[in-house]
Amino acid sequence: MRVIAGSAKGMRLGPVPPGVRPVSDRAREGLFSSLALEVPDARVLDLYAGTGSMGIEALSRGAAHVVFVDRSYEASAAIHDNLDRTRLADRATVVTEDAAAFVAQAPPTTGRFDLVLLDPPYDVSASSLEDVLRGIGPERLSDLGWTVVLTRGVKSSTPVIPIDWAVARQLRYGDSLVILYREVSWA
């Protein structure tokens, strides 16, 4: 795996921890091409962060700050290593916690986000994801427009989304389906 574009372009990321399925370079490249205008200066939340490849791509492309969340200590260590490799650690926070527990904390201590990236294991149930999506809620999202990106297996069920969200775009890369959600008024 490597960083596709931006300040860390071409830098190789470290080994993938056991049980982590990172988004392919091709899918990341396509996704971030679609998000080209949203990433610069964005505050980003990377849930189910794994190796951190999605959030690191956002940082490399000019995101102001990324909060990485993964429940695995091995994944958190890999994220720290990859942030050091790419020299992007100064604009990142790594939290070792379950995604649902992280979004359930009240009040949000990490501010509001312009972009939320979710790349859960394909076997995470749609109902579990619905809890996480509800937990993201309006108090965690920017008032000036936001995008939530969910990666699922093409054979995985997709969650029911909050009523004020709309599917803005769907992208398919091999066995991955990438869904971009936006607030109804912004879609």
Stretch-by-stretch model annotation:
Residues 1-187:
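Class I S-adenosyl-L-methionine-dependent methyltransferase catalytic core
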